[in-house]
Amino acid sequence: MQVRIIAVGKIKERFLSEGIAEYTKRLSPYLKLSIVEIPEEHRGTRAPAGQEELAKEKEGGRILAAIPERAYVVALDLRGTEISSIELAARMHDWQLAGTNTIAFVIGGDLGLSDAVINRAAFRLSLSPLTFTHPMARLILVEQLYRACRINSGEPYHK
């Protein structure tokens, strides 16, 4: 199975980059992971709401262009469904049994995801009711993917 994480913005904090690199390495026996970083749309510090919406739409267009054809799309969204690690593992297993070869997880920038991206998603996932920075959400996602792979392989994992 292939997993593509499509995220707006670059990781600036070294500790997050190192954590993501570590889990990417750990995931390699289980799946092929690629991460695509979409440039943030530049806007003024006090941009009017209309300009922010336009920026979100432009980012959304770049996200949609990065989604592989026929990929199962999961949008990380505060209004999405909260699931446990075991439920994520079960869903990934089910998606694979249904013939899904590629899963695309999308993470928006500070403006969130455009309506077009949300509408393209087959599933909306909330990592937590807590608020995370988008780079932190990326680290949590790759850790949870690793945990799901361990669960599906019948290997021990921290509970």
From Swiss-Prot:
One of its GO terms (cellular component) is cytoplasm. The keyword Cytoplasm applies. It catalyses: pseudouridine(1915) in 23S rRNA + S-adenosyl-L-methionine = N(3)-methylpseudouridine(1915) in 23S rRNA + S-adenosyl-L-homocysteine + H(+). GO terms for molecular function: rRNA (pseudouridine-N3-)-methyltransferase activity. S-adenosyl-L-methionine binds at residues 76, 108, 127-132. It comes from the Archaea. It is an enzyme of class 2 (transferase). Its EC number is 2.1.1.177. It is found in: Cytoplasm. Pfam families: SPOUT_MTase (PF02590). SUPFAM superfamilies: alpha/beta knot (SSF75217). Keywords: Cytoplasm, Methyltransferase, rRNA processing, S-adenosyl-L-methionine, Transferase. InterPro entries: Alpha/beta_knot_MTases, RlmH-like, tRNA_m1G_MTases_N. Specifically methylates the pseudouridine at position 1915 (m3Psi1915) in 23S rRNA. Belongs to the RNA methyltransferase RlmH family. HAMAP family: 23SrRNA_methyltr_H (MF_00658). This is Putative ribosomal RNA large subunit methyltransferase H.
